[in-house]
């Protein structure tokens, strides 16, 4: 904010969910919502245009898998995905409330994965480990963000 940007992309939430299930230090949905609300308010006060981004994915398949060298059963994966969807709904709601632009990366990633993951791979489509983006994932986000800069 101190650099006084004209445009700010706010893209947070993956670690809030992932760390909740991985190391027990993530955020619950109220903490996430209140924190995101504060970031939006502080950023809007500068006059910058805000583009809110939904969190993307944890894992690229349906079912259990090893996430960053840590096995996760199907129940845990379903819970993480339910949390990611709830966090994405928070972003969508706050975007309407604060009249910001919305970049629904979660929807975009899920669509891309459903069209390009015929083998139900847990990683390698848009991430290299189920969480961290590979070159294709980074390019997909960059291409989506560029649309807002034109």
Where are these regions (language model features)?
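Alpha-helical cap/lid subdomain in secreted, periplasmic
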Residues: 1-150
